[in-house]
């Protein structure tokens, strides 16, 4: 099993798809990594040799991924909340941030419906 950036890459998947198991690496980034390393997208992870894996590790090392990316995102959200701007206010209240309607829908952000009795108390 290949281990890149502290993540086990599934050996039965293609290199492009396997790389997406790393937080912060999507399909496009995975394709760019494979291209930079000279590896075919459709090559299985188990078929990659050590030199290929080392090239991939080097490319992935240049990116902001996993814990660093999560930390950066949380710091950015905290900064918005500290500023008191509209987006920060929406984050703080747990409401949609990007202008979606809230009269109906937005149940994912707002959580399950509260009954009329719960609102009166």
From Swiss-Prot:
Keyword Lipid metabolism assigned: no
Top-rank lineage group of the source organism: Bacteria
GO MF term (any one): structural constituent of ribosome
Any Pfam family matching the protein: Ribosomal_S13
GO biological process, one term: translation
Renumbered residue ranges of the record's region Disordered: 94-121
Keywords: Ribonucleoprotein, Ribosomal protein, RNA-binding, rRNA-binding, tRNA-binding
A cellular component annotation (GO) from this entry: small ribosomal subunit
Family assignment from sequence similarity: Belongs to the universal ribosomal protein uS13 family.
Primary role: Located at the top of the head of the 30S subunit, it contacts several helices of the 16S rRNA. In the 70S ribosome it contacts the 23S rRNA (bridge B1a) and protein L5 of the 50S subunit (bridge B1b), connecting the 2 subunits; these bridges are implicated in subunit movement. Contacts the tRNAs in the A and P-sites.
Subunit structure of this chain's protein: Part of the 30S ribosomal subunit. Forms a loose heterodimer with protein S19. Forms two bridges to the 50S subunit in the 70S ribosome.
Record protein name field: Small ribosomal subunit protein uS13
Organism classification: Bacteria, Pseudomonadati, Pseudomonadota, Betaproteobacteria, Burkholderiales
